[in-house]
Regions:
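Glycan-processing catalytic domains of CAZymes
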Residues: 1-200
Length: 200
């Protein structure tokens, strides 16, 4: 309510991001997304709502365990079943879902996003990818991702049929003003890609 009272009249206030990030059907998340999304829509006259869950795959970083692989990767059939159930329960309250792409292996990303897109069409929810611009394959947490890995993820998302892409996190990992030297090169490669380079 406070955010709406302060900023709701600004033209830049175009919708809501529900910040609860989950990867699976857990913690009464259907009720949380349903109630929060419904509240935000009613408060703002129907402005769109979005969530950005992660794919709980082999690359998922668990700060409470040693190593990157948390040892609890979701299978594709379980992902499909759980997200169908979640989407069925939040239809009309959540308009778009941007799946964080860093949790699963590159070879599995297209399959997970394809399943998500199919479920999204079934339930009337727009599916996007949330491209993580940092590298999970390095012993240091976290450095800007190599361009060829980002391109691989963008192409997998395109093949899966996502509606669009968002990114986490531009200012640290891809900005030409970032303190990470690697971010400057990543930004140049991405600009070249947008201009039609690298044979989209």
């Amino acid at each position: 309510e406070e955010a709406w009272e302060r900023y709701g009249s600004h033209p830049a206030f175009a919708g809501w991001y529900l910040t609860q990030e989950v990867g699976r059907l857990q913690w009464n998340i259907i009720e949380v997304f349903h109630e929060l999304g419904k509240f935000c829509k009613e408060l703002s006259g129907g402005l769109p709502t979005a969530i950005s869950p992660y794919i709980e795959g082999i690359q998922l970083y668990d700060p409470f365990r040693t190593g990157v692989n948390a040892g609890k990767s979701v299978t594709l059939p379980d992902f499909e079943r759980e997200w169908n159930e979640i989407m069925a329960g939040i239809t009309g309250c959540v308009d778009s879902i941007s799946f964080q792409d860093g949790g699963c292996d590159y070879s599995e990303l297209e399959d997970f996003l394809s399943v998500a897109c199919y479920a999204g069409k079934k339930h009337g929810i727009l599916i996007n990818t949330n491209v993580e611009a940092f590298d999970r394959d390095m012993p240091i947490r976290f450095l800007p991702i190599k361009w060829d890995k980002m391109l691989l993820k963008l192409r997998a998302a395109e093949k899966a049929g996502v509606a669009g892409a968002t990114m986490f996190e531009f200012s640290h990992f891809m900005s030409p003003n970032s303190s990470y030297f690697q971010a400057h090169g990543l930004n140049r490669c991405y600009q070249h890609y947008l201009a039609g380079g690298f044979e989209k």
